[in-house]
Design a protein with these regions (language model features):
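N-terminal amphipathic/hydrophobic interface segments
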Residues: 23-555
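Bacterial Sec-dependent N-terminal signal peptides
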Residues: 1-28, 555
Length: 555
């Protein structure tokens, strides 16, 4: 029979606790602060004091700063353990509050198990789950039966989770989802710090904002400021572009992203790519800058055009993109190679400008014509070397094929003679215009002070007839398979065909001749300078993978 022994129980328990503390060192005994009544049922609950609510007096148990309130509690003094149910409230100071239907508590191990509509309340957020484990010695609370975290704006769910009370940190595992009005996050594993609003990701993770999408398998993210860094297969989907790299950085407020090591910026609309080892992207200005072995890949003639420079800058929307290359520009295509100090590519008009850095006053004074020509932009078509002060290449944007070529100022075409060991066919003039058909250079017009040296052979026996040395106002040249097959001179050409022996060796090259075959890229690797090839990728400090969720199961 239940008796109202409230005050008697308190006195007995307090005395018992004092004697126990004096008698032995170790875990403190659970204290009974109040109860509406007490009884025992040794058959069903051997060794238990059954504490119950009566007349609005609920059961209050205290253990080392933790207060547990309930309607009924089965207290086992010898085990320093109790089970409680009925509107259970567990509080630890003013920092932690748990409400649930049932709770078990081991005072020796300081372990609690709460289940049934569990709610863990903090000043900054609340956790709801079906079953919650609380380890007071390690200041941890964890669940593995699906949980929901709520704050003022954000809802977070996961199958498993652990809360590090001292660190004010949550770790969520398996099917992690964060739903915020401004972004959504899904992850395999996520660590979240409540004071800094910062999240760390481990495993496949995606972040979807209003104007961006991010994927990574390691990373960190400030959920308040919407900025973070991302590693391991990281991708930012941003303004019709994909940004990839070993390490990515992103700031939503600044419309800014950066990438380090093995980066690629892919324009998904025009299918162009820029690679390198460092890049910055500015969404508001619709621009990107890439350095460290930077290389752009564009489609021309249904073929890849590779462009390398110390620095590449892309600006404008996809349909009007401008690509600029600065310093030591080199280009490679299956039927075309090139080199210049700088490059300007307009993807809406299909115009490529290859330019040089102007010579200084001193260089203009002391350089020979050959030395000046060595600094000019240069192209190689087949066996032909073409150079000049400026080179313009234009593509037909409808069929994506090369359409025309223009070389402005000091235009040169040099071709190693196919039979002579030392001879070069040369054409020099002020302006060069070339036409393409189906991507092949078929016609060239050269005007203004045109000079020619050309080795002539018999059609049948391929015997050298002589060397043609001519000056004229202009000429037209027909090519096939990137080789000169016919030349027509215009406006009172002045020249003669001389036997090889009658033309001195020092007169077999036009003034300013400079053969640059050793600069010609043979493959994509040749696009990079020796400095580029020596470049070492700087290691990135990886985010450390955390320890397993639980090393041991909870008993």
């Amino acid at each position: 029979m239940i008796k109202n022994l409230y005050f008697i129980v308190i006195n007995l328990v307090v005395g018992f606790c004092l004697n126990s503390i004096i008698a032995q060192e170790g875990p403190k005994i659970i204290e009974i602060l109040q109860a509406g009544g007490s009884t025992q049922d040794q058959q069903k609950f051997p060794g238990a004091n059954i504490l119950v609510k009566k007349d609005n007096i609920r059961v209050h148990l205290l253990h080392e700063g933790a207060l547990i309130k309930s309607n009924i509690s089965y207290f086992y003094p010898k085990k320093n353990f109790f089970k409680a149910n009925g509107n259970v409230i567990f509080t630890q100071g003013d920092t932690l509050k748990i409400t649930c239907d049932y709770i078990e508590y081991d005072g020796t191990k300081k372990l609690a198990i709460a289940w049934g509509k569990v709610l863990l309340e903090r000043t900054d957020m609340n956790l709801k789950t079906d079953t919650l484990y609380l380890d007071r010695l390690k200041s941890k609370a964890y669940y593995n039966t699906f949980g929901t975290i709520l704050d003022e704006q954000t809802k977070l769910t996961s199958k498993r989770g652990i809360y590090f009370m001292d660190l004010k940190k949550y770790r969520f595992i398996s099917d992690v989802k964060i739903d915020n009005p401004e972004y959504q996050i899904t992850s395999q594993q996520l660590d979240y710090f409540t004071e800094s609003d910062k999240a760390f990701f481990y495993g496949k993770t995606s972040i979807k904002g209003e104007e961006y999408d991010i994927y990574c398998e390691k990373g960190s993210y400030d959920t308040k400021l919407q900025k973070g860094s991302f590693q391991k297969n990281a991708i930012i989907f941003y303004n019709n572009k994909e940004i990839r790299g070993d390490s990515l950085y992103f700031e939503n407020e600044r419309d800014y992203a950066a990438a380090t090591n093995n980066i690629s910026i892919i324009d998904t609309l025009n299918k162009s790519v820029i690679n390198g080892h460092y890049g910055e992207i500015f969404k508001t200005r619709d621009s990107a800058i890439i350095t460290q072995k930077a290389m752009a890949i564009n489609i021309v003639d249904q073929d890849s055009l590779f462009i390398h420079a110390d620095t590449l800058i892309a600006t404008g929307p996809s349909e009007k993109r401008i690509l600029r290359g600065y310093y030591d520009v080199r280009i490679f295509k299956s039927d075309l190679r090139g080199k210049s100090d700088s490059l300007h590519l307009n993807e809406s008009s299909g115009l490529i400008k290859m330019l040089k850095i102007p010579l200084s006053r001193k260089e203009n004074q002391i350089f020979t014509e050959s030395q000046k020509n060595a600094r000019n932009p240069v192209l190689w078509f087949g066996k032909s070397q073409m150079s000049g002060n400026k080179i313009f290449l234009t593509s037909n944007m409808k069929n994506q094929k090369l359409d025309s070529l223009k070389i402005i100022g000091n235009s040169w075409i040099i071709e190693k003679d196919s039979l002579s060991e030392t001879g070069f066919n040369q054409i020099k003039g002020g302006l060069l215009d070339g036409l393409f058909e189906d991507g092949e250079l078929v016609e060239i017009d050269i005007t203004k002070n045109t000079e020619v040296i050309y080795y002539m052979y018999s059609d049948e026996e391929n015997e050298l007839i002589g060397i043609d040395k001519t000056t004229c106002s202009s000429l037209k040249m027909i090519t096939k398979d990137n080789q000169i097959v016919d030349i027509t001179f215009f406006v009172t050409p002045d020249g003669q065909l001389l036997p090889e022996k009658d033309l001195p060796i020092n007169e077999r090259k036009l003034k300013g001749f400079y053969w640059r075959e050793d600069e010609r890229p043979r493959n994509i690797t040749d696009l990079f300078s020796e400095k580029d090839k020596r470049y070492q990728i700087k290691p990135i400090e990886n985010i450390k993978t955390p320890e397993p969720f639980l090393k041991k199961s909870v008993n």
